[in-house]
A protein has these predicted regions:
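Single conserved hydrophobic/aromatic residue that forms the stacking wall/gate
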Residues: 1-8, 12, 240-241
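Glycine-rich loop-to-alpha-helix module at the N-terminal edge of alpha/beta enzyme cores
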Residues: 9-89
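PLP-dependent aminotransferase class I/II
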Residues: 16, 40-45, 214-215, 219, ...
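Buried hydrophobic positions in well-ordered alpha/beta secondary-structure cores of metabolic enzymes
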Residues: 23, 51, 75, 88, ...
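Short pre-catalytic strand/loop immediately N-terminal to key active-site residues, enriched for Gly-Thr
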Residues: 60-64, 204-206, 233-238
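PLP-dependent aminotransferase-class I/II
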Residues: 94-149, 153-159
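Catalytic PLP-binding core of fold-type I/II PLP enzymes
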Residues: 155-189
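Active-site PLP attachment segment
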Residues: 190, 198-228, 239
Length: 242
């Protein structure tokens, strides 16, 4: 029973007694340990282990942040860092958040106009248009897409479109980012919407119902890719499940 109130965050109802109990238990210990992740908490590792046990083999490292838009920011950074490219591709109708990078790959101009200029080298293709994918080449660092668009009105792409997108990313060494901040955590009948398309992203971003009303988000990728964030500069080692 997934309640869609409060921007799709309350997936296990409001003030579920078990959630309240666990929050109180954690407050009695501590809430935060060191800014740059010099120490990790056991409960963070348990969260990472539990989540990644439900995901495909290459999605085996979780980095925890405060929100979905932060998860998308980190995913975009990782795509650029891993490929040493600058171009990002998103889709018309997309919404990925309101921070600088996430807003850049979002498509609603009413939300973007007051904050321009945003990130350069961002291109928006028509959503669910198979032919438009031919625009993509080896100059692209990452492609970010909602497996089901939310802000645009619950738009579901075709199986053909999603599988061609995965194939093009593989052929051009592009990182494919699935933003499941709205569509994830069981809202489609599977834990994540990408499971309906028989493909797996390189990076998965999560939020909203992932925290059940608490301010938490995350992005999941492979240990190999996540290790790029270990230094120069790092993103906080405590949030990496290895």
């Amino acid at each position: 029973h997934c309640v869609t109130r409060r921007q799709r965050q309350m997936c296990i109802r409001d003030r579920h007694p078990q959630i309240i109990k666990e929050i109180k238990k954690q407050i009695d210990k501590h809430l935060h340990v060191m800014v740059f992740g010099e120490y990790s908490q056991r409960i963070q590792n348990e969260l990472a282990e539990n989540l990644t046990s439900l995901l495909p083999e290459n999605l085996n490292c979780l980095y925890v942040v405060n929100s979905g838009t932060e998860a998308n920011e980190a995913a975009l950074k990782l795509a650029k860092r891993a490929t040493k490219r600058t171009k990002l591709v998103a889709f018309k109708g997309a919404y990925h958040g309101s921070t600088h990078g996430s807003l850049s790959v979002s498509a609603n101009e009413d939300k973007k106009a007051a904050f321009r200029p945003l990130l350069p080298d961002v291109f928006h293709l028509p959503f669910n248009n198979v032919e438009a994918l031919d625009f993509i080449d080896k100059s692209v660092a990452g492609i970010i897409i909602e497996p089901i668009q939310g802000d645009a009105g619950i738009r579901i792409p075709s199986f053909e479109f999603m599988n061609k997108l995965r194939k093009i990313c593989d052929e051009n060494c592009i990182l494919l980012i699935f933003d499941e901040i709205q569509s994830g955590m069981g809202r489609t009948g599977k834990l994540f919407a990408f499971e309906h398309f028989d493909i797996v992203p390189d990076i998965l971003t999560i939020g909203k119902a992932f925290g059940g009303g608490m301010p938490i988000g995350g992005f999941v990728t492979s240990q190999k890719l996540m290790s790029l964030f270990n230094n120069h500069p790092n993103l906080g080692l405590s949030l990496i499940h290895i």
